[in-house]
Structures are given as C-alpha cells and as structure tokens.
C-alpha cells in the first residue's frame, strides 16, 4: 500500500512539470506580442486577440495536466 502511495505522489509531482513549462511558454508568448506591437502598432488589437488565444491554449494544457494528476492521486 505504501508503494502505491509513493507512485501516486510521484505521478502527481510529474504532472506539475507542465506548469513550469507553461510559465515559460506564456513569457515567450507575451514577449513575442511586445515585439510584434513595437514593429506594427496599428495591428495591436488583432495581435492581442491571437495572443490571448495562445494563452488560453497553454493554460488549458496546464489545467488538464493538473486535474489528471489529482485524479490519479485520489483514485
């Protein structure tokens, strides 16, 4: 029983790794937004809409990974 709990804890820890990758991805995404707006300020609204869609996609994968880890840990 202790081995199963240890494996579940490791799986939960491994499912937290995409959170750090998502933080890096969001930073790169908004850095690209800043560069794009500085080069073409007239298209700032269009670029921002695409940036928000990318942000939502990244966060979706983070939440899926987190909930998968929680489900594995508690079931």
Swiss-Prot record:
Q: Which Pfam families match?
A: ATP-synt_C (PF00137)
Residue stretches spanning the membrane? 10-30, 55-75
Q: What is its main location?
A: mitochondrion
Give the CC-aspect GO terms: mitochondrial membrane; proton-transporting ATP synthase complex; proton-transporting two-sector ATPase complex, proton-transporting domain
Keywords, sorted A to Z: CF(0), Hydrogen ion transport, Ion transport, Lipid-binding, Membrane, Mitochondrion, Transmembrane, Transmembrane helix, Transport
* SUPFAM superfamilies for the chain: F1F0 ATP synthase subunit C
InterPro entries for the chain? ATP_synth_F0_csu_DDCD_BS, ATP_synth_F0_csu_sf, ATPase_proteolipid_c-like_dom, F/V-ATP_Csub_sf
Any single GO molecular-function term of the entry would be:
lipid binding
Which Gene3D superfamilies does the protein's record reference? F1F0 ATP synthase subunit C
Mitochondrion as UniProt keyword: yes
Q: Where is this site: Reversibly protonated during proton transport?
A: 59
The membrane topology noted for this protein in its Swiss-Prot or TrEMBL record is: Multi-pass membrane protein
Can you list the disulfide-bonded cysteine pairs? none
The entry's localization annotation reads: Mitochondrion membrane
Entry keyword annotation includes Metal-binding = no
Record's superkingdom? Eukaryota
Describe its function.
Mitochondrial membrane ATP synthase (F(1)F(0) ATP synthase or Complex V) produces ATP from ADP in the presence of a proton gradient across the membrane which is generated by electron transport complexes of the respiratory chain. F-type ATPases consist of two structural domains, F(1) - containing the extramembraneous catalytic core and F(0) - containing the membrane proton channel, linked together by a central stalk and a peripheral stalk. During catalysis, ATP synthesis in the catalytic domain of F(1) is coupled via a rotary mechanism of the central stalk subunits to proton translocation.
UniProt subunit comment: F-type ATPases have 2 components, CF(1) - the catalytic core - and CF(0) - the membrane proton channel. CF(1) has five subunits: alpha(3), beta(3), gamma(1), delta(1), epsilon(1). CF(0) has three main subunits: a, b and c.
Which family does the similarity line name? Belongs to the ATPase C chain family.
Protein's recorded name: ATP synthase subunit 9, mitochondrial
In its UniProt entry, the species of origin is given as: Paramecium tetraurelia
Question: Lineage from the top down?
Answer: Eukaryota, Sar, Alveolata, Ciliophora, Intramacronucleata
């Amino acid at each position: 029983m202790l081995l199963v709990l240890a494996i579940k804890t490791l799986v939960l820890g491994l499912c937290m790794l995409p959170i750090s990758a998502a933080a890096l991805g969001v930073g790169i995404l908004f850095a690209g937004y800043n560069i794009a707006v500085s080069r073409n300020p007239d298209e700032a609204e269009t670029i921002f809409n695409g940036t928000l869609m990318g942000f939502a996609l990244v966060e979706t994968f983070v939440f899926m990974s987190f909930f998968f880890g929680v489900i594995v840990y508690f079931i």
